[in-house]
A protein has these predicted regions:
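Short, small-residue-biased leader/transition segments that mark boundaries at the very start
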Residues: 1-5
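Residue-level recognition of conserved beta-strand edge/terminus positions
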Residues: 6-7, 43, 144
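Feature captures the catalytic cores and cofactor-binding loops of soluble hydro-lyases/lyases
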Residues: 10-139
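Active-site/ligand-binding-proximal alpha/beta "capping" segment
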Residues: 68, 144-163
């Protein structure tokens, strides 16, 4: 069960989301084209020689829930993180035909082996929380919430409650 992802994604965590929201509120230009984009909730560690990136595991997605519906309504197509999402986020995923993927928590050192490029594109002063453009190649993910609202957190609980 699961999928692999091959495309460009953008990292963004709490502090970067706050700044992105501020840019939206002020009518400023976002650091990347949000329409069709994928955001990976991660704050990679420093890069070792010969590697594109350091450890890069997912951050708890719920911390970005206050921002997710707005970004989804602006065209964000996918989010990657770990953990459940609030009902408002699930509704926005369905409304916009988006998807939420879960990455494997605690496996950041393995995840970095599936990232071939990394470039800081915004908020460099935030360090590991800066916005980075990453290129994923065979990055392992699980579809957690699909475009029609299928939700593994709900179906999983229901399935095991029946056992």
């Amino acid at each position: 069960l699961g999928d692999v992802y091959k495309r460009q994604v953008y990292t963004s965590r709490d502090a970067a989301h706050k700044r992105i929201k501020q840019l939206i509120d002020e009518g400023g230009e976002l650091p990347f084209e949000i329409d069709g984009a994928t955001i990976y909730y991660a704050g990679p560690t420093g890069t070792k020689e010969g590697m594109a990136i350091g450890s890069c595991g997912p951050t708890t997605s719920g911390r970005m829930d206050p921002y997710a519906p707005l970004l989804l309504d602006m065209g964000l197509s996918a989010m990657i993180g770990k953990g459940e999402r609030k009902p408002a986020v699930v509704d926005a995923i369905k409304r916009n035909g988006a998807v939420y993927f879960c990455a494997i928590g605690g496996a950041g050192a393995l995840a970095c082996q599936c990232i071939t490029e990394c470039e800081v594109i915004a908020f460099e002063d935030l360090g590991c929380e800066s916005v980075k453009k990453l290129t994923f190649d065979k990055f392992p993910l699980i579809v957690a919430i699909d475009a029609v609202g299928g939700n593994i957190f709900e179906t999983g609980r229901k399935q095991y409650a029946e056992v």
